[in-house]
Regions:
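Conserved motor-coupling elements within RecA-like helicase/translocase cores
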Residues: 159-191, 198, 208
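Conserved helicase/translocase motor-coupling segment
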Residues: 63-152
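Structural motif
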Residues: 136-137, 192-194, 225, 233
Length: 264
């Protein structure tokens, strides 16, 4: 369970790479002082072991009981974007039709690439009549809004994408784009993840990873990594070696997951 936080309640101008977070204790944390705990060991969500193996090792001490997969294909796709740039400061971005405003804490190339990936996923789903839901998750509100705008804009030119969005709107698993804080409780067949952070225009990767750097940031990552039932599409501008060792547990977990996704 994620503890409550005011991290994402700040205004749109708040620079979310600063790592300023105020967590309160969760209800479960408070209850532990009064009640005994018992682990629920059977894992049912992930249809492929590779979607849960990382969390099983790093968070559950390999205590989860995971049904074997029907095939050996690794269910996580690592889309590394070598030329992407993370802009922590405010900038102006325009799409093909109009300006979509000024904002900081965004990665434009990553937003475009993940939007293209989502649109392609939607088109294939409709053309091949494959019923599969999807959700996009990223690290802050600015990138969330940018990705959502890119997808909605691209979908106006792709009838299949519009059909897909409308088809899922009336279900329990509608298409949406969320930030890291708001994805707890969600699940979809496929999760698209924009890790957002990366080198700046000078080629320097700052070690500020927003809510991930918080003392409980690793728990947010665990929630993120375990939302997918069939597959996870990772879009990242980072390689594991640019993340320094040390610091909060969230940073080391983030680095380990990038390595896990890239080496399969």
């Amino acid at each position: 369970q994620l503890p409550p936080t005011n991290f994402f309640n700040a205004s749109s101008e708040f620079n979310t790479d600063d790592g300023i977070v105020d967590d309160d204790e969760s209800i479960l944390d408070l209850a532990l002082s009064k009640f005994s705990s018992r682990m629920l060991r059977w894992h049912y969500r992930s249809k492929h072991e590779s979607l849960i193996n990382f969390s099983n090792y790093h968070f559950y001490q390999n205590n989860l009981i995971i049904p074997p997969s029907a095939n050996d294909k690794f269910a996580i796709t690592n889309n590394y974007l070598k030329k992407a740039i993370y802009s922590a400061s405010t900038l102006k971005k325009k799409n093909a039709k109009e300006s979509i405003g000024e904002r900081g804490g965004v990665n434009i190339i990553e937003a475009n690439e993940i939007a293209d990936g989502v649109i392609a996923f939607m088109r294939e789903s409709i053309k091949k009549n494959i019923k599969r839901s999807c959700l996009v998750v990223t690290m802050n509100n600015s990138q969330r809004d940018l990705i959502d705008e890119e997808i909605r804009h691209k979908a106006t030119k792709i009838p299949e994408a519009n059909t897909y969005i409308g088809m899922w709107d009336e279900t329990m698993e509608p298409f949406t784009v969320k930030n890291l804080e708001n994805v707890q409780g969600d699940e979809r067949d496929y999760i698209f993840v924009s890790t957002l952070f990366g080198p700046n225009k000078e080629g320097i990767t700052m070690q500020r990873f927003g809510p991930i750097n918080h003392p409980k940031g690793h728990r947010r990552l665990n929630v993120l990594f375990t939302r997918a039932k069939q597959g996870l599409e990772l879009y990242t501008s980072l390689t594991p070696n640019v993340i320094r060792d040390g610091g909060e547990k969230g940073r080391s977990i983030f680095k380990s997951y990038l390595d896990y996704a890239a080496t399969q």
